[in-house]
């Protein structure tokens, strides 16, 4: 009977994956009534069938030539009233003595007069309390056998199905009188369009499928297999005859078990396989025809699918949908699973799938003619072939797509429907995932294991899972993955409610909300488990595939959707795409705009988890275990790898480096950082954030606004971390790399670290500037970006690795409570400079020297004085910024904090002339001339504690400096006269005196020269010679110019205006004018001025007496003015005379020689 067409096996395998079918199979009773009704009403098919069933004038007799292999037994004994002499219009089953009691007990009275209705009623009885007697069973068996082989029934079939038979050549050629005609029509039932013929054959099918022995040819094909699998142990006798459906069920289980074993002990023969699958196909529309499943699930059908209309496989689908309900009986669940496994082997076992997709299978050549026999009917191939058409943009009917969705969901829901999973993952399932068989939990458990969260999985199992994910394609519709669907339902309802249900962008939306408050933990796990596989096959992201398939084919040499290349590693195509996504126009071969946007979207989403980057996880697995085993929180693993970049294996380092380089161009890849920085981006960087092409602008903006009030800790830490990573390689700063690439190759070859490149380039720029080179070696665009990088590095000591390494121990010792950032650590080190270790001290000194030459690099000064710079120095050059601020320091509009910071920098400058570039330039001739002795003792990179400046101050008092140097020293003297802290030598030598004699003045918030005045007044109380010398030097300086004596200048300001306005300031001219005015009795000075002048005269007089001689002239003057002048002169004269006398008396010391020897 069953000459299997080649297409059947292909459709079979596909059905294994569908888990949520809603169709149901027609129950025989559903059609019998109408047919009989039509028989009474006059339908030819109905009348003839009814008449035939009633025209059996005698009970069915045993026909030896047609007995099946397992005979039903001898004919029943003739009972009264059942023979030809029976009443009514012919022989009736209900009147047979052997069945009368059973019919009366089981069947409704209105069916008794119709043999087919009685037959249907009795053969569907399975309850123990209603069990049919053995004699009645035997009678029914022979009656059905006669029906299937009776030539009269065949003649009815030929009449009712005349046009159908002419269309189906196979049936027209069947021999007459052997029952093959009806069997052939049953075989082609799906192709019968004639209504009456279809109804007739449906009735006959119900009779034939009630017992495997009635299926023509089935016994011949499966006899040996029945014995081999021991499926024939169910004998007729006391048991229900209709349990013969168990034999077919047993064979089906043997068939699916064989597919799940590597080396099956028992193999079903090919002929029997075809027969089993064909029986399953023919019972696909009416679940009543699968006798084992019908009896196993009859109660469950009433419970779950009571309102489901029978026919076209709807009952099957409804039961599939409820397979994992708690109240589903275990025997029904097992029967449904077996049915689903058969669908996986032959898609035609699913009536609705085969019917809905028939035209599409033919249209896209997914049918028999194109494929090797082993694959043609498998559900997996059908799904892959049709999904490939969908992904290529071809039209597949909505009915077919709906069926595909159901069966893809079915495969994802129950791992046991995929023989490859059972074969390859049996050990892993037993070890890691036992007891998780329902609702897709086992598959997700295996996914979790593969992600490395619970152990390792074999490659075969991993490959089987990857294949299953491709077959089911849950990336196209999240609902296919039931475990994910249930876990993420709440998130979808809140975060993704604006997206249509089933849209592929739902998964994208979930990824965007990963690690947010809206995400729930269970959804997070299920999502990452699925994304792990999607990330390894670019085709599994339908939006990416649709928009990039052209680019992938052109640039990455990809295959079709359902073709794979074993030579291509996981994630290789996507890696290829993102390499081309960030190419410039000059580099060529770029992606289309749509594809580029998709690649960026996925990059942004997947960067949150290293496991979603196959190449990264593969190459860095050892390094992750070695360096980052404790970094388990979100995003920490990649940060950890970046932190240990120099320690990583070469392959891992290259991948991490490339990814970091990519991040520098498009920082939005750092999705967690972007999420943390969202408020700052919205407030300060929305312009650059909206740009489709980032090119490093967004990170630059975040760095510039890192210390805004709105900045949160997570964002600041993230930005700083990225800055620290950038220091490891100049390629990690995209804008710097693009602006200076050529300059680095030319001027700084073989230099990798960013800080070294910055130093190299900035040194070149500085040298060219100092040497006033006609043309800078560093290009203009590079110089501009170099300035940005230099400014960014000043913000955090960690961004200057050499300084940081040199000062680590000092930071722990003196700045342990100070936070990084805002240059706070650097400022702390400056304040504790005297206590620093030698190496750190030298580095800090070098830093200060650089900052004084270029104040814009002084982050703290620029930050504190930002508004004052805008107010007072908007036009000032970066190198003259501090000079400008100093000039406006005493303005009433000057901010106190900025003024304090300027004073700090002045104090620093006055500790060493090298920290004052203006002074250094103005006095470059004077310093070696007058202070050579100090310079010879000085060491590089250590302060001179103001010795050179003190030396120049003394020469200023003697009016011996050059005019430029004199101007600068005058400013320094004026400033230090107002604030003692600006005189390092005074601070150094008079610290005890200030603390003891002038504590109140020193504590004043505003320094206006009170401390200096206090020291002058208390000069006689000072015991320390060095301090006394410093005070005397101050007095000497003030004598040179009134401007350097703020107290005196303030007291005499009006007098200078009235009496000395015409006198040019400088070189003591105005001071001399005031002294003359004091001596002139005609001039009346202000009382305060007069008092201060008299005090100064006394001080100068005392200073002249006690001050040490600076030179020979000073020494001669001191002798001449000394009260012991005569005594000193006498001693000197006597000494000379004694020396002369000794010479006369002792003669020459050298030996006499002749003139000749002298002249020789």
From Swiss-Prot:
Keywords assigned: Cytoplasm, Cytoskeleton, Glycoprotein, Golgi apparatus, Membrane, Phosphoprotein, Repeat, Sialic acid, Signal, Transmembrane, Transmembrane helix
UniProt GO molecular function: fibroblast growth factor binding
Protein name per the record: Golgi apparatus protein 1
Record's bilayer topology term: Single-pass type I membrane protein
Signal sequence, renumbered to the chain: 1-18
Stretches in topological domain Extracellular: 19-1126
UniProt keyword Chloroplast present: no
Location of region: Disordered: 52-94
Biased composition (Low complexity): 52-79
Function: Binds fibroblast growth factor and E-selectin (cell-adhesion lectin on endothelial cells mediating the binding of neutrophils).
Cys-rich GLG1 repeats: 97-130, 131-193, 196-259, 267-327, 328-394, 395-454, 456-518, 519-585, 590-649, 651-709, 710-769, 777-837, 839-892, 893-960, 961-1016, 1022-1082
Modified residues (Phosphoserine): 942
């Amino acid at each position: 009977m069953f000459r299997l067409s080649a297409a059947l096996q292909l459709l079979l395998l596909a059905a294994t994956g569908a888990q949520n079918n809603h169709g149901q199979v027609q129950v025989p009773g559903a059609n019998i009534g109408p047919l009989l009704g039509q028989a009474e009403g006059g339908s030819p098919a109905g009348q003839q069938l009814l008449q035939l069933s009633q025209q059996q004038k005698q009970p069915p007799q045993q026909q030896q030539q047609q007995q099946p292999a397992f005979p039903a037994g001898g004919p029943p004994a003739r009972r009264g009233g059942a023979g030809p002499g029976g009443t009514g219009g012919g022989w009736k089953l209900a009147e047979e003595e052997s069945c009368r009691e059973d019919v009366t007990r089981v069947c409704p009275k209105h069916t008794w007069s119709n043999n087919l209705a009685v037959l249907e009623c009795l053969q569907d009885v399975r309850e123990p309390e209603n069990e049919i007697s053995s004699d009645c069973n035997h009678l029914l068996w022979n009656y059905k056998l006669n029906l299937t082989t009776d030539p009269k029934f065949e003649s009815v079939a030929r009449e009712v199905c005349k046009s159908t038979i002419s269309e189906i050549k196979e049936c027209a050629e069947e021999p007459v009188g052997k029952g093959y005609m009806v069997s052939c029509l049953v075989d082609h039932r799906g192709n019968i369009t004639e209504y009456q013929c279809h109804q007739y054959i449906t009735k006959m099918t119900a009779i034939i499928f009630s017992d495997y022995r009635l299926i023509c040819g089935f016994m011949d094909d499966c006899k040996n297999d029945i014995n081999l699998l021991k499926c024939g142990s169910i004998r007729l006798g006391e048991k229900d005859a209709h349990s013969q459906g168990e034999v077919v069920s047993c064979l089906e289980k043997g068939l699916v078990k064989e597919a799940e074993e590597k080396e099956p002990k028992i193999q079903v023969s090919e002929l029997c396989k075809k027969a089993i699958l064909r029986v399953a196909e023919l019972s696909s529309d009416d679940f009543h025809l699968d006798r084992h499943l019908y009896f196993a699930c009859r109660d469950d059908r009433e419970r779950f699918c009571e309102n489901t209309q029978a026919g076209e496989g709807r009952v099957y689908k409804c039961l599939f949908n409820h397979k994992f309900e708690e109240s589903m009986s275990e025997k029904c669940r097992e029967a449904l699973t077996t049915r689903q496994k058969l669908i996986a082997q032959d898609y035609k076992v699913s009536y609705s799938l085969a019917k809905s997709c028939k035209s599409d299978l033919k249209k896209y050549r997914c049918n028999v003619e194109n494929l090797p026999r082993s694959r043609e009917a498998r559900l997996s191939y059908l799904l892959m072939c049709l999904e490939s058409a969908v992904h290529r943009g071809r039209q597949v009917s909505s009915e077919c797509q709906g069926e595909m969705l159901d069966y893809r969901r079915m495969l994802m829901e129950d791992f046991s429907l995929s023989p490859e999973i059972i074969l390859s993952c049996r050990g892993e399932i037993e070890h890691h995932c036992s007891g998780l068989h329902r609702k897709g939990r086992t598959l997700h458990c295996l996914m979790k294991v593969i992600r490395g969260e619970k152990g390792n999985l074999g490659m075969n199992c991993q490959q089987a899972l990857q294949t299953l994910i491709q077959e089911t394609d849950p990336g196209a519709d999240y609902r296919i993955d039931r475990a994910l669907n249930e876990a993420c339902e709440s998130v979808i309802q809140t975060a993704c409610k604006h997206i249509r249900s089933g849209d592929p962008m739902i998964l994208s939306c979930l990824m965007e909300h990963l690690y947010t408050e809206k995400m729930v933990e269970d959804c997070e796990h299920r999502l990452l488990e699925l994304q792990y596989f999607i990330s390894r096959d670019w085709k599994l992201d339908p939006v990416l595939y649709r928009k990039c398939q052209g680019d992938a084919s052109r640039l990455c040499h990809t295959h079709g959707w359902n073709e794979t290349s074993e030579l291509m590693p996981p994630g290789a195509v996507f890696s290829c795409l993102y390499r081309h996504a960030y190419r410039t126009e000059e580099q060529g071969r770029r992606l289309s705009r749509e594809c580029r946007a998709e690649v960026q979207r996925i990059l942004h989403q997947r960067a949150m988890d290293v496991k979603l980057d196959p190449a990264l996880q593969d190459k860095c697995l050892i390094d992750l275990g070695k360096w980052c085993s404790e970094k388990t929180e979100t995003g920490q693993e990649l940060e950890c790898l970046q932190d240990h970049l120099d320690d990583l294996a070469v392959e891992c380092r290259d991948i991490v480096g490339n990814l970091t380089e990519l991040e520098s161009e498009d920082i939005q890849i750092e999705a967690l950082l972007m999420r943390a920085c969202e408020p700052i981006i919205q407030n300060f960087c929305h312009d650059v954030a909206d740009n489709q092409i980032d090119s490093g602008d967004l990170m630059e903006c975040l760095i510039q606004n890192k210390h805004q009030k709105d900045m949160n800790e997570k964002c600041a830490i993230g930005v700083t971390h990225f800055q620290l990573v950038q220091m490891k390689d100049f390629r990690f700063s995209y804008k710097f790399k693009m602006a200076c690439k050529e300059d680095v190759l030319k001027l700084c070859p073989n230099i990798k670290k960013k800080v070294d490149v910055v130093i190299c380039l900035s040194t070149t720029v500085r040298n060219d500037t100092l040497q006033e080179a006609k043309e800078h070696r560093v290009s203009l665009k590079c110089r501009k970006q170099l300035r940005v990088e230099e400014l960014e590095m000043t913000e955090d000591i960690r961004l200057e690795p050499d300084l940081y390494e040199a000062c680590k121990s000092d930071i722990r010792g003196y700045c342990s409570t100070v936070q990084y950032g805002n240059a706070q650590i650097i400022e702390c080190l400056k304040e504790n400079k005297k206590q620093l270790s030698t190496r750190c001290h030298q580095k800090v000194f070098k830093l200060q020297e650089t900052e004084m030459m270029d104040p814009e690099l002084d982050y703290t000064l620029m930050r504190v004085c930002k508004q004052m710079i805008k107010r007072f120095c908007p036009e000032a050059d970066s190198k003259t910024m501090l000079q400008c601020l100093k000039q406006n320091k005493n303005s009433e509009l000057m901010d106190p904090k900025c003024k304090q910071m300027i004073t700090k920098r002045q104090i620093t400058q006055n500790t060493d002339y090298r920290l004052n570039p203006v002074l250094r330039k103005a006095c470059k001739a004077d310093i070696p001339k007058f202070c050579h002795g100090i310079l010879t003792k000085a060491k590089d990179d250590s302060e001179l504690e103001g010795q050179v400046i003190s030396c120049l101050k003394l020469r200023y008092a003697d009016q011996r400096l050059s005019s430029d140097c004199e101007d600068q020293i005058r400013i320094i003297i004026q400033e230090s006269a107002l604030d003692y802290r600006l005189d390092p030598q005074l601070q150094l030598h008079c610290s005890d005196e200030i603390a003891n004699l002038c504590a109140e003045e020193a504590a004043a918030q505003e320094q206006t020269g009170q401390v200096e005045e206090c020291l002058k007044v208390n000069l006689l109380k000072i015991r320390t010679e060095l301090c006394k010398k410093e005070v005397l030097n101050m007095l000497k300086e003030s004598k040179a110019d009134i401007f350097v004596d703020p107290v005196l200048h303030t007291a005499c300001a009006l007098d200078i205006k009235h009496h000395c306005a015409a006198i040019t300031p400088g070189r003591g001219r105005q001071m001399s004018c005031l002294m003359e005015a004091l001596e002139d009795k005609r001039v009346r000075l202000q009382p305060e001025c007069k008092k201060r002048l008299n005090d100064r005269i006394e001080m100068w007089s005392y200073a002249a007496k006690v001050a040490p001689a600076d030179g020979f002239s000073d020494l001669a003057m001191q002798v001449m003015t000394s009260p012991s002048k005569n005594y000193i002169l006498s001693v000197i004269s006597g000494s000379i005379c004694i020396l002369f006398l000794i010479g006369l008396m002792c003669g020459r010391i050298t030996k006499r020689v002749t003139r000749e020897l002298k002249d020789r």
